[in-house]
């Protein structure tokens, strides 16, 4: 949820029926309000943050994530993650934007060194706060090098199009929320079920071994060779590499 329509009734329903919720907040007030404004241009931060804090506390700081998207406009995204922690959140995620290269906020290849340094900066502060008793969980640092998911999960990755679907407010079914609006990936509707089974079958075969450039990648069983949406946007087929 983006939090705009979140109220006590919705919180109560989610706490009763949903084991995990994702609360969309892009970080600091200026960052969030630039990317998540209302139609009149005003920002959403002041409205949604108190609701998210109440929601997280109602779950005893478990079974939720505050999740943001960083863009070229905030390559200092570690400050946004730490802002979550300063607001009292303990479960958080921050992911790079998926955008057409023509967009001014799209991440470019020359940004990668700065992004890698920022993850290092975040990791150092993450460890520091953990030692100080102010720790938090950052989803993308939760990587178990000795155990982790089963081999089938490592091969298949996120499971989009087969293990889960995105449902729009109009009931349309897509392999994942990032595909919503792309008609070539419309799988059906909640009333009709999955009608376009060819899409499901394509995603069913989308795994590490189906990706031609991924079979020699040393970390392929940790990233499952990347995101199908990114592959479709930038490399062609959903089983391409990105």
What is each PLM-predicted segment?
Residues 20-21, 62-65, 91-93, 136-137, ...:
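Beta-sheet entry/capping signal
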Residues 103-182:
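A C-terminal junction/extension of Radical SAM enzymes
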Residues 9, 47-50, 79, 114-117, ...:
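Generic recognition of stable, solvent-exposed alpha-helical segments in well-folded globular domains
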Residues 31-35, 102-103, 186:
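Short, charged, surface-exposed secondary-structure boundary motifs
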Residues 4-6, 28, 71-73, 99, ...:
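Short, solvent-exposed loop/turn segments at secondary-structure junctions
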Residues 1-97:
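Radical SAM/AdoMet-radical enzyme domain recognition
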Residues 181-242:
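Flexible mid-to-C-terminal extensions adjoining Fe-S/redox cofactors in radical SAM and related proteins
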Residues 32, 175-176, 226:
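Short helix/loop capping segments that flank catalytic or ligand/cofactor-binding pockets
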């Amino acid at each position: 949820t983006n939090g705009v329509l979140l109220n006590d009734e919705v919180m109560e329903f989610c706490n009763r029926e949903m084991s995990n919720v994702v609360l969309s907040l892009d970080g600091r007030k200026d960052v969030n309000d630039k990317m998540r404004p209302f139609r009149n241009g005003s920002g959403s931060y002041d409205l949604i943050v108190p609701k998210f804090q109440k929601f997280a506390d109602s779950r005893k700081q478990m079974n939720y994530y505050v999740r943001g998207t960083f863009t070229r406009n905030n390559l200092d995204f570690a400050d946004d993650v730490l802002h979550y922690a300063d607001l009292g959140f303990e479960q958080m995620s921050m992911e790079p934007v998926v955008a057409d290269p023509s967009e001014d906020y799209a991440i470019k290849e020359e940004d990668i060194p700065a992004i890698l340094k920022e993850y290092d900066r975040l990791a150092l502060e993450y460890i520091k706060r953990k030692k100080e008793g102010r720790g938090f969980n950052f989803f993308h640092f939760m990587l178990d090098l000795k155990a982790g998911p089963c081999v089938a999960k490592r091969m298949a990755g996120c499971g989009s199009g087969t293990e889960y679907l995105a449902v729009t407010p109009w009931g349309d079914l897509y392999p994942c929320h990032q595909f919503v609006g792309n008609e070539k990936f419309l799988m059906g509707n909640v009333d009709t079920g999955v009608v376009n089974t060819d899409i499901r079958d394509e995603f069913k075969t989308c795994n590490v071994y189906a990706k031609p450039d991924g079979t020699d990648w040393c970390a392929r069983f940790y990233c499952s060779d990347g995101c199908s949406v990114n592959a479709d946007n930038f490399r062609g087929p959903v089983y391409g590499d990105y």
